[in-house]
């Protein structure tokens, strides 16, 4: 499966108004330095000590938003 990884700070910039809000991210344990990744389906996963947890998802045209903000492309 392909992902783009980023920090919580970058995720905050990407998330649209009709998606997760700051309080939702904080409740899921996401802070500025948290490592997160998004797959091509828009699922947001947060890095935990022993794996990854899905905490929500992005909607619509998130592909361009992610690639523009991170400067990265999808990686296996």
Locate the predicted segments by residue.
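Mixed-charge, Lys/Arg-enriched low-complexity segments
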Residues: 1-11, 51-76
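Acidic, low-complexity, intrinsically disordered interaction modules
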Residues: 17-67
């Amino acid at each position: 499966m392909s992902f783009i990884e980023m920090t919580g700070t970058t995720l905050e910039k990407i998330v649209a108004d009709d998606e997760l809000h700051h309080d939702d991210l904080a409740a899921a344990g996401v802070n500025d330095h948290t490592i997160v990744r998004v797959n091509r389906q828009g699922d947001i996963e947060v890095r935990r000590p022993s794996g990854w947890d899905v905490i929500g998802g992005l909607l619509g045209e998130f592909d361009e938003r992610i690639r523009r903000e991170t400067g990265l492309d999808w990686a296996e």
